[in-house]
Design a protein with these regions (language model features):
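A short pocket-lining beta-strand/turn micro-motif at the edge of beta-sheets
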Residues: 206, 215-219, 247-249
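Low-complexity, glycine/alanine/valine/leucine- and proline-rich hydrophobic stretches
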Residues: 214-242
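Charged, terminal alpha-helix-loop-beta segments
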Residues: 1-184, 190-209, 213, 225-227, ...
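Well-ordered alpha/beta subsegment
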Residues: 241-260
Length: 260
């Protein structure tokens, strides 16, 4: 169920490398990056230290992760196909302490916490713990850690600010208009900045993406070719050309006429 719950491809459980065992190794097909999933059983253990240890382990042994992917997926993944800058660690537990929650509340930290709750009727509720919008940078508290320096040189947590930096006020305003229109479609839609674009997701399904350009925006719609109702023929079929974001249709935006 990993694909439905987290939007990830399962690679291997109990993956061992350099005398360390990773509970689950997964792959994010959208960001083209590996994800390490650890199941926390000790409520008082440090998620920061363990998280950076695993991130460092992956960066130092990239070939082993590539080999494992290709052997289990019968694929032909190459080192350059992977965006190592978006590697992350996810801790899963029945509950996290306030200290653990606060420890990962940094806007540029590639470590996530997910809580799992099981109820009497055998239903299971799985939810990620959100970081506050006012969260600080991890660089303010971890500058003297050797592992931190190694990891932060290669791994980057992308933000809307990164992708909007240097853009004109008109483009920023245009982005905000379309972003708000998308979010107003459903309260469960989330904003997920990637390396080259900003993705909008609902329950780990990618709805669309906005690629910020110099004079406008490209909207990529996550619909397969032949399945989009576009009677006015506003979109372009990009199923046979390279592009950012998921989906086979693109709409170039320079004003607000497509908002409705």
């Amino acid at each position: 169920n990993m694909s439905e719950i987290m939007g990830l491809e399962m690679i291997k459980s109990e993956f061992t490398i350099k005398d360390r065992r990773i509970d689950t190794l997964a792959f994010d097909p959208q960001s083209k990056s590996f994800v390490i999933i650890e199941y926390k059983r000790e409520r008082n253990s440090s998620v920061i230290d363990q998280g950076f240890t695993y991130l460092s382990l992956m960066l130092q042994n990239q070939a082993d992760f590539i080999l494992e992917y290709n052997e289990t997926q019968a694929g032909n993944l190459k080192r350059n196909d992977v965006d190592w800058s978006q590697t992350k660690v996810v801790f899963v537990s029945q509950g996290f302490t306030p200290n653990q929650r606060e420890a990962v509340n940094f806007k540029d930290l590639s470590i996530e916490l997910w809580e799992v709750k099981r109820y009497e009727n055998d239903s299971v509720f799985i939810t990620p713990i959100r970081k506050s919008h006012a969260s600080a940078s991890i660089k303010t508290v971890m500058q003297n850690s050797p592992e931190f320096k190694e990891v932060t040189e290669k791994i980057k947590e992308y933000s809307e600010e990164n992708l909007l930096k240097g853009k004109s006020d008109d483009v920023v305003e245009l982005y905000e208009s379309y972003k708000n229109a998308i979010l107003n479609l459903n309260t469960e839609i989330e904003v997920k900045p990637q390396k080259w674009y900003i993705s909008f997701k609902k329950a780990n399904s990618h709805i669309c993406a906005l690629e910020i350009q110099k004079n406008g925006i490209k909207l990529t719609i996550n619909v397969a070719k032949g399945h989009l109702e576009d009677s006015k023929q506003l979109t372009r079929d990009i199923s046979t050309v390279g592009h950012f974001g998921n989906g086979d249709y693109e709409l170039k935006i320079s004003d607000t006429k497509y908002l409705e």
